[in-house]
From Swiss-Prot:
One of its GO terms (biological process) is cell division. This is UDP-N-acetylmuramate--L-alanine ligase. Pathway: Cell wall biogenesis; peptidoglycan biosynthesis. InterPro entries: Mur-like_cat_sf, Mur_ligase_C, Mur_ligase_C_dom_sf, Mur_ligase_cen, Mur_ligase_N, MurCDEF_pg_biosynth, UDP-N-AcMur_Ala_ligase_MurC. GO terms for molecular function: ATP binding; UDP-N-acetylmuramate-L-alanine ligase activity. Gene3D superfamilies: Mur ligase, C-terminal domain, Mur-like, catalytic domain, NAD(P)-binding Rossmann-like Domain. It catalyses: UDP-N-acetyl-alpha-D-muramate + L-alanine + ATP = UDP-N-acetyl-alpha-D-muramoyl-L-alanine + ADP + phosphate + H(+). The gene is murC. Its EC number is 6.3.2.8. It comes from the Bacteria. GO terms for cellular component: cytoplasm. It holds the Pfam family Mur_ligase_C.
Length: 496
């Protein structure tokens, strides 16, 4: 249980789990604003090292005395609802001392007060779309504050306290945290049942997006993807309640009878080995329509949709459309979103955070499009690690279908994260449903994963490590093993 005071004293803030992507970003912003920041985490990380260089006091391991790292006790303690158990010794000590304990989402809401909030929500694509919006707004000279779940490749950070009026952030629906915010622009990329361990039913999950739409401030906008049926329906319901709703998508893929106007229409999507050339017709309320073109260097139609959402959201937030489009051309991606890790022996290795069947399908389709555009017979090899027992049991058949888009696959055992193992449940429930004629390896031994991938791959292939857990480390191990007897090849930005 957490406390949510109307106004929180943010002069001295302690983070329990400060190394997480979401928590470390908010800690960065607080340090930049002059707050005394302390925290703890179970292990060292790059995020911890960076925060220490900025002046934060951080302990490795959780203990009650960590509340005294900076001398005086903190004025507030911040925790992540999903990752930190409520009997954590620091949380217990804080409550005994009468120190307010709040969630990360409560802190983000406090930090966004007084800003024009641009919130990106949806089952998939939040991090990529948020990152694109930030890149576009930066190019437009607006210097937005931002908090992202991943690290921008070009900026090298996941958060920033800007001088501009806009604050761009992800709106996480997994525990209804998105209902803490008051967006001027609220984007819904798509809606597909997920996090049912929290919501219980698909209907309850859908409802949280309806409630999010109702959080849009007076004069603000809800932006929805009209290619996604549930997002479009949510937009239509919101419009009936008097909310200003605008849509985006390719005209040929949108219901022409939709009550939501198509404000960012994708007119052209020309795919090449270098990425895609995009042409969009932007029709903002009260303005003459204009056509804009940009080149997108991250593959996949899902990324094209994300870029259209970012363009529309950025324009509604006050950015010049032509400058926003230039910012999308400059966008080089986000860590762990089809991230290029390197190449050895002609085998290119990419890493992606996808952990839902729809996301796995999207990233494998993007890899397939890249391979086909090169026209050199490249194959796609997937190394997948399921995330959560509950999600694996619910979507085993869908994961099998998604992985079948690859030419071959290595499937690691389940990364349980916050969940306890379920007796009799392994990743075999996925591999047993995959095509019999497809080369598939079920690998319960994590240390063997890199070798398994290498046994399947050949020069010219694209290898993808996929998942929200420790599979990201396999990408580096693959490159190390491939290059062990060769001179290491310097990783360089590929033509994606």
């Amino acid at each position: 249980m957490t406390d949510t005071p109307a106004t929180t004293d943010l002069s001295r803030v302690h983070f329990v789990g400060i190394g997480g992507s979401g928590m470390s970003g908010l800690a960065r912003i607080l340090v930049s604003r002059g707050a005394v920041v302390t925290g703890s985490d179970v292990k060292k990380s790059t995020a911890v090292d960076v925060l220490r260089t900025m002046g934060a006091h951080i302990a490795i391991g959780h203990a009650a005395e960590n509340l005294d790292l900076a001398g005086d006790k903190p004025t507030v303690v911040v925790t992540s609802f999903a990752a930190i158990p409520q009997d954590n010794p620091e949380l217990t000590a804080a409550r005994e001392a009468g120190i307010p304990v709040i969630r990360r989402s409560d802190l983000l809401a406090e930090l966004m007060e007084g800003h024009r909030q641009v919130l990106l929500a949806g089952t998939h694509g939040k991090t990529s779309t948020t990152s694109m919006a930030v890149s576009a707004l930066q190019q437009a000279g607006l210097d937005p504050s931002f908090a992202i779940g991943g690290q921008l490749n070009r900026a090298g950070t996941n958060a920033h306290g800007g001088t501009g009026d806009a604050f761009v952030a992800e709106a996480d629906e997994s525990d209804a945290s998105l209902l803490r915010y008051s967006p001027y622009v609220a984007v819904i990329t798509n809606i597909e049942p997920d996090h049912l361990d929290y919501f219980g039913t698909a209907e309850s999950y859908y409802q949280v997006f309806d409630d999010f739409a109702d959080r849009v401030v007076e004069g603000g906008y809800l932006v929805v993807c009209l290619e996604d049926a549930q997002a479009a329906t949510t937009g239509e319901r919101a419009a009936q309640r008097g909310i200003q709703v605008l849509g985006y998508g390719a005209g040929s893929a949108v219901d022409e009878d939709s009550a939501v106007p198509l404000a960012a229409e994708i007119l052209e999507e020309t795919v090449s080995a270098a990425g895609a050339h995009i042409r969009v017709r932007l029709a903002l309320p009260g303005q003459a329509p204009q056509e804009l073109s940009y080149d997108l260097h991250v593959p996949g139609h899902h990324m094209v949709l994300n870029s259209a959402a970012a363009l529309l959201a950025g324009a509604l937030a006050g950015g010049d459309p032509a400058e926003l489009a230039a910012g999308l051309t400059d966008f080089t991606g986000v860590r762990r979103r089809f991230e290029y890790r390197g190449s050895e022996r002609g085998i290119r290795v990419f890493d992606d955070y996808a952990h839902h069947p729809t996301e796995v399908s999207a990233v494998l389709n993007a890899a397939r499009a890249k391979a086909d555009a090169e026209g050199e017979g490249a194959r796609v090899i997937a190394c997948f690690q399921p995330h959560l027992y509950s999600r694996t049991m619910k979507f085993d058949a869908e994961f099998a279908q998604a992985l079948a888009l690859a030419d071959a696959a290595v499937v690691l055992d389940i990364y349980g994260a916050r969940e306890q193992p379920v007796e009799g449940i392994t990743s075999r429930i996925i591999t047993d449903k995959m095509p019999e004629d497809m080369p598939v390896i079920f690998e319960p031994d994590f240390s063997e994963a890199a070798g398994d991938v290498i046994s399947l791959a050949q020069s010219g292939d694209i290898v993808l490590t996929i998942g929200a857990g420790t599979v990201t480390y396999v990408a580096g191990e693959i490159l190390s093993e491939l290059g062990r007897n060769n001179e290491a090849e310097e990783p360089k930005e590929p033509n994606v």
